A protein has these predicted regions:
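C-terminal edge strands of extracellular/lumenal beta-sandwich accessory domains
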Residues: 20-49, 125-154
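Hydrophobic beta-strand segments within beta-rich accessory/binding domains
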Residues: 68-72, 77-85, 130-133
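Non-catalytic, beta-strand-enriched accessory regions in extracellular/secretory proteins
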Residues: 52-74, 119
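Beta-sandwich interaction modules
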Residues: 71, 113-125, 136
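Short, surface-exposed beta-strand/strand-loop-strand elements in extracellular ectodomains
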Residues: 88-103
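Short beta-strand segments within Ig-like beta-sandwich modules, predominantly Fibronectin type-III
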Residues: 60-61, 108-113
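Extended, low-complexity, turn-rich repeat/linker tracts enriched in Gly/Pro/Ser/Thr and Asp/Glu
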Residues: 85-92, 139-141
């Protein structure tokens, strides 16, 4: 499973890096359109579904520094969690936390310096997980952008 996820994400990220600049032209004059981030997500969604993965959560929103979301994950599954930014975002990260004795502890993170982040996790137990999306750097003249978050498994 991890190997399959690895190859899926390699294909996904190479496609996104090549096409990122093209998505800027889809935005409106005010820079508020969701079209660029949705266009960026489309090839990934198609690839995920062609490879028989199931998307169990999709989220698209505006972000300046960080957003947090929660999801119950199950120990019987290995999950891929992908966060990606639109043309304005230069560095986005994702971190997954598990609740241990009432406190959130870091389970896995991707802190690479690029506009997409991915982790593959297999929870130790069924339970709620905290997913934190953080933006550390924007492209010149931007301080806000849209992000996409996808959670998937086989």
């Amino acid at each position: 499973m991890k190997l399959k996820l690895f190859f899926l994400f390699i294909l996904f990220f190479s496609t996104l890096a090549f096409a990122q600049r093209e998505y800027a032209r889809l935005d409106n004059d005010r820079g508020t359109s969701m079209e660029p981030i949705l266009a960026r997500a489309e090839p990934l969604i198609e690839e995920i579904e062609e490879d028989d993965f199931e998307i169990v959560r999709m989220e698209f929103d505006i972000i300046s520094t960080e957003k947090v979301t929660y999801r119950k994950l199950y120990k019987d599954w290995t999950y891929g969690i992908v966060a990606f930014g639109d043309y304005r975002i230069k560095d986005i990260d994702v971190a997954v936390y598990e609740k241990v004795r009432g406190k959130w502890e870091l389970f896995e993170k991707d802190a690479e310096n690029d506009d997409e982040a991915m982790v593959s996790i297999k929870p130790y137990k069924d339970g709620e997980h905290k997913i934190e999306i953080s933006v550390f750097k924007y492209n010149k003249d931007y301080y806000v952008g849209h992000y996409g978050l996808l959670i998937l498994h086989e």
